[in-house]
């Protein structure tokens, strides 16, 4: 009888299943690596590359910039990202330091691929001058976004399906 509303409801429920698979898969199969990358300030070079799964991060540069008239200082590192040796983009994670409150805010950099996301966080510099890096590979996260898109389509289809006033037979 009310096919658009039924189909929209079915599509919305199927979308929730896709979102659930994406969330479970991305949390159960995440690959996480925390490491220090040696840095030589005199030559502005890193002593090594950062390896995680089939990804390689190669140091490019770093910068310190003042934002909001010096109220915030941003420490940023720039890396070229490679997957299986092929360049996939550049990541520029940073640490923001609020001068007045001395609070730090970590700003991640993400490269999204069809099957997984490369999530890069710069945590600052240790006493030896090495960069503290936290890198994660989140698989199946794109399923969450695809599921959300399906959910919105399902809601629109279900809402667009007109419901007729029911007649009571006597």
Spell out what each predicted region is.
Residues 1-170:
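Solvent-exposed, non-transmembrane regions of integral membrane proteins
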């Amino acid at each position: 009888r009310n096919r658009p509303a039924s189909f929209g409801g079915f599509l919305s429920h199927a979308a929730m299943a896709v979102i659930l698979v994406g969330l479970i898969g991305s949390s159960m199969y995440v690959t996480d690596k925390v490491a220090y990358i040696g840095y030589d300030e005199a030559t502005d070079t890193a002593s090594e590359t950062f390896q995680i799964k089939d990804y390689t991060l190669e140091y490019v540069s770093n910068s310190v910039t003042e934002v909001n008239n010096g109220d915030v200082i941003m420490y940023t590192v720039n890396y070229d990202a490679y997957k299986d040796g092929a360049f996939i983009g550049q990541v520029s994670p940073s640490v923001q330091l609020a001068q007045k409150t001395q609070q730090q805010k970590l700003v991640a950099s993400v490269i999204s691929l069809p099957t997984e996301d490369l999530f890069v966080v710069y945590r600052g510099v240790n006493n030896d001058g090495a960069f503290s890096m936290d890198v994660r590979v989140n698989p199946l996260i794109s399923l969450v976004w695809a599921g959300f898109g399906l959910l919105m389509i399902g809601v629109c289809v279900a809402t667009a399906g007109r419901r007729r006033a029911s007649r009571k037979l006597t």
